[in-house]
Amino acid sequence: MTSPASAPAASNTWPGLISALINGDDLAVGNTEWAMNTIMAGEATPAQIAGFLVALRAKGETVEELAGLVEAMVQHANPIDISGEKLDIVGTGGDRLNTVNISTMAALVAAGAGAKVVKHGNRAASSASGSADVLEALGVRLDLSIEQVARNAEEAGITFCFAQVFHPSFRHTAVPRRELAVPTAFNFLGPMTNPAHVQASAVGVANARMAPLVAGVLARRGSRGLVFRGDDGLDELTPTGPSTVWEFRNGTVKEQVFTPADLGIRPSTVADLRGGDAAANAAVVREILDGKTGPVRDAVLLNAAAGLVSIDLHAEGSLEQRMRTAFARAAESVDSGKAAEVLAKWTALSQS
């Protein structure tokens, strides 16, 4: 493939962009930003959207191409104003391993440890229970005004930006995505398009090729944090063995390997992390916040620690050293009851 600098500039038309992609040419940021703006405005046909997505996926997305999609999507989002430093802990999904809602539990634990968490998510796509599904099962209302969503963050230390509320223009992609029924670039945009413009993100990406690209886009946008992928295929920091981690800050990305055994965590299996429907996964959330030990707790604390490391990237030390300190903070959040208190307060606020 050729780079935008060496390739002829593709014209901002559907035939121009799709032809360039078929030829193996990388698009410029402005090209994909135009494409997404056109889609978000409802001015692209399902055939044009599908052709663009398939051609882009077949060529292989670049950081610049994803950055253009993200920029346009953020421009079309409903804005929300939440004060201070904010953190998102989120996975792209798509690992098809049907685990419990690890990132949702990790978000509660990180909030209990003092982080202001603004989680951006949706209903399940490839599993039985997405973050929105399990939060509803826990009693957190999602049919809130934007002002109420912001209030939850300010008063409870955590909130949830429901993707379909904050990105209504994304509805124009529904038909071609459903009919294609294969992953495309759009499956990876959620963690990069938090409408609260969070400063820090801990992002699990199951797709090994896409993970460093997500880190690259977030770095390009001035964010900081960690992108990770378990060697077992999980879109989480996994307790089953090593994970590859891409640490991004100050516009740069550094790849490294994290091994949970270095923190004294006993190896487990993906089967130990399997979940069920929203009601079953909500019961697991309550068990973990009540202090139940085992592989699920290990996974939750690891991912909460990743979030705490992400928002505190100025701290000194190796990734292992910083994870060790953050893991202890996450454990204290659960064992002191602070994480459970966060959920109780959030639920009550959302119902008031």
UniProtKB/Swiss-Prot annotation:
Signal peptide limits: none
InterPro entries: Anthranilate_Pribosyl_Tfrase (IPR005940), Glycosyl_Trfase_fam3 (IPR000312), Glycosyl_Trfase_fam3_N_dom (IPR017459), Glycosyl_Trfase_fam3_N_dom_sf (IPR036320), Nuc_phospho_transferase (IPR035902)
Binding, anthranilate 1: G91, N122
Positions with a binding annotation for 5-phospho-alpha-D-ribose 1-diphosphate: 91, 94-95, 99, 101-104, 119-127, 131
Family matches, as Gene3D superfamilies: Nucleoside phosphorylase/phosphoribosyltransferase catalytic domain, Transferase, Pyrimidine Nucleoside Phosphorylase, Chain C
Binding-site positions, Mg(2+) 1: S103, E236
Catalytic activity: N-(5-phospho-beta-D-ribosyl)anthranilate + diphosphate = 5-phospho-alpha-D-ribose 1-diphosphate + anthranilate
Textual note on the cofactor: Binds 2 magnesium ions per monomer.
The protein's role, per its UniProt record: Catalyzes the transfer of the phosphoribosyl group of 5-phosphorylribose-1-pyrophosphate (PRPP) to anthranilate to yield N-(5'-phosphoribosyl)-anthranilate (PRA).
UniProt record similarity statement: Belongs to the anthranilate phosphoribosyltransferase family.
Protein name in the entry: Anthranilate phosphoribosyltransferase
Species per Swiss-Prot/TrEMBL record: Paenarthrobacter aurescens (strain TC1)
